[in-house]
Amino acid sequence: MNKFVNRRCAAILFLFLLVWSSSGLAAEENLLGVYGREGAQFLIRERSGELELLYKAENQEGQEFASYCSYPLRKGADGSYELLLFGPAQQTQAKVRFFYDAAQRVTGVLLGEKRYGKQSFAQEEGKTFRIQPQLPLAGLRQKALQAKMPVEEGAFLKPDLVELKNMDASLQLDIRYATDNNFMGMPLYEEGRAFLQRPAAEALVRVNQALKKYGYGLIIYDAYRPWYVTKMFWDATPEAQKVFVADPAKGSRHNRGGAVDIGLYSRKTGQSVDMGSGYDEFSLRAFSWYPGGNSVQRERRELLRLLMAGEGFAVYPEEWWHFDYAAWRSYPLLNVPFHEL
């Protein structure tokens, strides 16, 4: 699909986003989320101004909700909810009761006679997701700096890293790894700067300009990443969460200057907008095609994906914020610190 088709799709999508924004379900946002017990898991989401319960399809491995069954969740006149279950020959209804804590946050739901807890996320409490490091943070940097980067064979293009802020001043930077506001809880970069290989940087600027008519701009969380930082990620991250970090034995696309982590900000307010999960949140909600949340969140992701695809970027399935430039394989792994660029 070329960039012109992608931009037309993005424009149509944005019209739907505006319609939903004007009618939304703000009062019921608290109900949206991931619920589960004893291995069973389901989502409650908003779609077209209505609530739905999504149940993972049978025989689907993992918890990604790549396929699911959806059921309407309707609010009655007395404020209670009913789940509408449709079958080949009949329709049944089940009462749904939500539970709240002292702060009026939803903690669980009763379906029939079973109670399911609602999963909590750091972003919902104004916090940043953190891992439980597998090694002491104090020794991670020294170990990574002493490690040897993998040797690659083949011909590569000469690196031409350029600083993104110099390419377009309207790009916002929120380089989390230059602060302790990240999943590791410690600064990993000595400077809050962002670099990409020149063709990727130029394509990213075009996306940022295309977003203007939708009222958005790009916010950059990470771009080129020295290899030693990828090594730190890997050594610190628990085995079950390694799907969210690159194996240093292969290197990251960030290490080549061919990947970028981004979100959207409002050009009206200058503030980042809600994309349905926090950046670097190691959870189901981070998956690019996560079907939960509300329509605006999902459509913002789709708008970003469409415009980025039109300029040669592909989204990483497990991370809505991560995009790889088409030519990332053409560049070598790099371990150059920012102050040397």
Predicted regions and their residues:
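Bacterial N-terminal signal peptides that target proteins for export
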Residues: 2-12
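N-terminal signal peptide c-region/cleavage motif recognized by signal peptidases
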Residues: 21-22
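K/E-rich alpha-helical interaction surfaces of small helical-bundle regulatory domains
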Residues: 30-41, 308, 312, 319, ...
